[in-house]
């Protein structure tokens, strides 16, 4: 607490906009760079989203450009206003405190910026930043020795999150919208208790398929014979009466689930690597082949495939053991399926899903009347979360997620890295740890402290 009251007498030029003594010109530099990068980010993003959603011509003519400009304005405002409040706070306080160059400047900037963005996007942005802020606070705690890291902690968190998600998925009206659709795509509609696919309908379809096969000429090719053999093996085998996978036995049901989601995971990772591979198509053609046999492709495939197969296998096993189908099975099956993250460890995925789970449970509590509703909660949470991340970006970059730090550098055209962090080292956060050899060249006419003098608290 004592560190919060300590201060240094340097001005905003000496600490923040070291490339330009003028606060106004520095603000314009940040604004121009942020606007340029924001348009580069949101223009293709909204265009691709519109194509995938099969928007009509009216959307492209009247709504696409305003939405791009609104989101770009939000991101630009977040970066530019941080620079503005950075200078304003220094002029008001007359000094820099531990909290003022990061948290203090980012809090009002983020609050004003999020009000510019469309309401439909605020919730998603809040979840992302809350997740990032939580991860940053955790790393700060670890760096200070307050928190002890848990081996495979991200896997354990994912197991707990998966258990709760799958339980809500199995419950009637437990999940809605995109989350429900995504889980139905991953684990299949057979695991939904309200699944309306009756055994009679299933067997009727099987008979129809058989009749169609019989109508075909006898000269069947090898592929058709193999397919017929596989179908025969899948249909004849152990399947509990409570299992709703009517066209498969329990074993083939799990195997098919693994193969399907392994393929999906493999293809997703391949697609993510396509842009970087094509950039080196002419200079390093061999890198194009690595697109298909990269280790991460198989890791993501193994993660998704094993998650589905473990979940389905455990669910079938519990139905056999207990001789009934129960929503509580999903808790055990989901927890065990979460172990699959050992193939593809990701703190980002675990934290994001956990944040979404908290949001889901919060809104369920509101619907049940057990939790109070807080107006503008998303705006406040976003502002505080972003301020925490900016505090880390200024005072202790080593605790910030590397991908977000790269994003901040891109948004500010690299100017976030030219802050005079050696001066900030006196606060004891290791501000210059990642910048040991950088010292800005300052014009002595605009400085308040001679750079050669030792820095002391005032």
Swiss-Prot record:
Name of encoding gene: TMEM135
Major localization listed first in the record, in broad terms: mitochondrion
Alphabetic keyword roster: Membrane, Mitochondrion, Peroxisome, Transmembrane, Transmembrane helix
GO molecular function: lipid transporter activity
InterPro entries reported for this sequence: Tmem135 (IPR026749), TMEM135_N (IPR031926)
Family: Belongs to the TMEM135 family.
Disulfide bonds: none
Protein source organism: Bos taurus
Upper taxonomic lineage: Eukaryota, Metazoa, Chordata, Craniata, Vertebrata
Membrane topology: Multi-pass membrane protein
Keyword Mitochondrion listed: yes
Pfam families for the chain: Tim17, TMEM135_C_rich
Name under which the protein is recorded: Transmembrane protein 135
Cellular localisation: Mitochondrion membrane; Peroxisome membrane
Presence of keyword Phosphoprotein: no
């Amino acid at each position: 607490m004592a560190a919060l009251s300590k201060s240094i007498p340097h001005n905003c030029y000496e600490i923040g906009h070291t490339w330009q003594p003028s606060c106004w010109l520095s603000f314009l530099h940040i604004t121009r760079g942020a606007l340029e990068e924001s348009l580069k980010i949101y223009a293709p993003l909204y265009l691709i989203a519109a194509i995938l959603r099969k928007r009509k011509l009216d959307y492209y003519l009247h709504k696409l450009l305003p939405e791009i400009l609104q989101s770009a304005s939000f991101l630009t405002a977040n970066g530019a206003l941080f620079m503005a409040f950075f200078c304003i706070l220094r002029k008001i306080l007359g000094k820099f405190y531990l909290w003022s160059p990061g948290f203090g400047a980012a809090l009002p900037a983020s609050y004003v910026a999020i009000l510019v963005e469309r309401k439909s996007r605020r919730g998603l942005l809040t979840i992302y930043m809350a997740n990032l802020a939580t991860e940053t606070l955790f790393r700060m705690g670890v760096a200070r020795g307050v928190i002890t890291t848990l081996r495979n902690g991200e896997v354990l968190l994912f197991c707990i999150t998966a258990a709760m998600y799958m339980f809500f998925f199995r419950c009637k009206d437990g999940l809605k919208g995109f989350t429900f659709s995504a889980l139905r795509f991953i684990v299949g509609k057979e695991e939904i208790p309200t699944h309306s696919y009756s055994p009679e309908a299933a067997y009727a379809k099987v008979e129809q398929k058989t009749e169609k096969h019989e109508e075909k000429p006898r000269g069947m090719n090898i592929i058709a014979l193999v397919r017929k053999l596989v179908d025969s093996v899948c249909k004849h085998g152990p399947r509990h009466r409570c299992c709703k996978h009517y066209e498969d036995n329990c074993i083939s049901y799990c195997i098919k689930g693994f193969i399907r989601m392994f393929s999906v995971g493999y293809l997703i990772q391949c697609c993510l690597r396509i842009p970087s591979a094509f950039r080196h198509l002419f200079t390093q053609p061999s890198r194009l082949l690595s697109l298909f046999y990269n280790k991460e492709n198989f890791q993501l495939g193994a993660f998704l495939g094993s998650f589905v197969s473990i979940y389905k296998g455990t669910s079938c096993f519990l139905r056999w053991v207990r001789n009934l189908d129960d929503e509580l099975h999903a808790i055990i099956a989901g927890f065990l399926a979460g172990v699959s993250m050992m193939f593809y460890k990701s703190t980002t995925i675990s934290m994001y899903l956990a944040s979404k789970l908290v949001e889901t449970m919060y809104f369920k509590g509101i619907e049940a009347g057990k939790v109070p509703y807080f107006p503008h909660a998303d705006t406040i949470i976003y502002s505080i979360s972003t301020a925490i991340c900016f505090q880390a970006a200024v005072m202790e970059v080593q605790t910030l997620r590397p991908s977000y730090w790269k994003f901040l550098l891109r948004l500010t055209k690299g100017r976030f890295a030219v802050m005079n962090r050696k001066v900030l080292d006196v606060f004891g956060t290791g501000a210059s740890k990642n910048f040991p050899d950088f010292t800005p060249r300052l014009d002595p006419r605009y400085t308040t402290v001679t750079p050669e003098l030792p820095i002391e608290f005032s």
